[in-house]
Swiss-Prot record:
It comes from the Eukaryota. Residues 397-453 are annotated as: Disordered. One of its GO terms (cellular component) is chromatin. Residues 397-417, 424-438, 444-453 have a biased composition (Basic and acidic residues). This is DDK kinase regulatory subunit DBF4. Signal peptide: none annotated. Changing A88V: Defective for interaction with CDC5. A zinc finger (DBF4-type) spans 654-703. It comes from Saccharomyces cerevisiae (strain ATCC 204508 / S288c) (Baker's yeast).
Amino acid sequence: MVSPTKMIIRSPLKETDTNLKHNNGIAASTTAAGHLNVFSNDNNCNNNNTTESFPKKRSLERLELQQQQHLHEKKRARIERARSIEGAVQVSKGTGLKNVEPRVTPKELLEWQTNWKKIMKRDSRIYFDITDDVEMNTYNKSKMDKRRDLLKRGFLTLGAQITQFFDTTVTIVITRRSVENIYLLKDTDILSRAKKNYMKVWSYEKAARFLKNLDVDLDHLSKTKSASLAAPTLSNLLHNEKLYGPTDRDPRTKRDDIHYFKYPHVYLYDLWQTWAPIITLEWKPQELTNLDELPYPILKIGSFGRCPFIGDRNYDESSYKRVVKRYSRDKANKKYALQLRALFQYHADTLLNTSSVNDQTKNLIFIPHTCNDSTKSFKKWMQEKAKNFEKTELKKTDDSAVQDVRNEHADQTDEKNSILLNETETKEPPLKEEKENKQSIAEESNKYPQRKELAATPKLNHPVLATFARQETEEVPDDLCTLKTKSRQAFEIKASGAHQSNDVATSFGNGLGPTRASVMSKNMKSLSRLMVDRKLGVKQTNGNNKNYTATIATTAETSKENRHRLDFNALKKDEAPSKETGKDSAVHLETNRKPQNFPKVATKSVSADSKVHNDIKITTTESPTASKKSTSTNVTLHFNAQTAQTAQPVKKETVKNSGYCENCRVKYESLEQHIVSEKHLSFAENDLNFEAIDSLIENLRFQI
């Protein structure tokens, strides 16, 4: 009860009741004290004239006045708190002193009832919370269920809609739980969500009081079997017909405008029923017979790096290596995996405090699947290994038993075996003769020079791409980044979209050849300058006096150490033995050469005087006995014996090939003379000048 001092209307010009109350008491005491003081003074002054009865009489009168004041305060009307439907109404001092009037006038009550009845018919959707309190027993639960049905019938008489599901269109939530501590509930709780969405949350007592104020007699409804429903409106009829079909037919029969799913299906729809269903798919059983060609994606087995919805048919999940690897991994992570399952399972909250894994796995839900269980697969392999071991042991015992039987019967069959051995010795050649024949063949073969056999081609470290053979990936690390990638192409790649209009752009035939950059980079350009192509030209002169010039070109292996050159002086030395045969002599020069791809050696020109009759014939023949890789070139030079002695050696005409040396940064007239000069040799012998190209070669060799 609120104290009277807080409810009284105060004025700054008037005393309040509280002040009066305290002041009156103080005044009474002061007056009494004053009278006593007066009495004492009078007594002191008129000690002889007064009597004892006078002060007693006046003190009794004052005591009576005090008692009357106390009785007046008790009879004062207390300030009361009046309640109405809108809320608490504070009654002032003036109204409190008067007789208590009705809280709400009949006119206000009628307006309130008509407004709420309109609201109930128009847009009220009521949801009854089915969650019970933990402490509620079975008797109270059945009692609350009956009361819930009674409240539903009461709201139906007002024309309100009762929804079976909670959604955002609900306006009132009626629950049997306590409404005081809603903020302590979880965010997913219905009461908490209703409070956040500004819905009304009522208890059963408040709902019953609300219906009573709307003149709904719940006692009468509890006695009658069926509730008197409100008059149906057109909107309600259309809504019910849309949901349940027309009223002139059986609602339990199938409807033509509704598709009923019979087989496995996917139905994705809007929970608020605002939008039409997004996905509706259904598959018949005949469409699901082939597991490899299912109409919907499923997880398939495959190696790492593969899409799990595509899988790999060549992937053997039941192989021994994979089973052992998977079993060891699952065994090591079993405890942690079960703890994760217990954490993420909604009804396993009570199992988190348990220490043993067996207690946690009791109430866990495992989804059935068709994948291979590592434990079962490992046990199968162990059983097969045990069977194979038993078979090998039995085979060994059988072999030993057979050997024992043979040894037992060996003595009995000695004569027969000796006869059979004699017959075989007569038919087959002796072993000694075979050994002698093999030794003789080996000695004869050692006499002839044997050709060295070529080394076997090394096996490739990587599989051949043409076969696309699957390799075992168990021993390969899972980190694919550790593998070496293929080396880059030796030339620069042409930029995307670049195409020249000159002849270079169309010089690749059908256009399928590799494209190269038309503009060389600075690094490649500087490296190409260090290379010099030694292309020596050949001058051919025709004289008036029948001068013949012959060009002899032979290919040989060129290196820094030795170069084979065909010189005219070498031919002149072989001229002496040919004089004895006659006037005309022939010098035969045979050279065996291998057709290797090396640059041609500088050709030599041989010129003879007009007085000397020389015939030079060059014939190249291939001997049938020679190998395919070698050819014999017969150079026959016919000289006149009389003029051979007087013939002078012809001077070589030096071919001047001028240019610019990028290394020495010097112009030269002859390349042959420049490469022998001291300046060029000092540059060529310094290894620091070739450090860049050496590193490039090492990198290319490493990638190959």
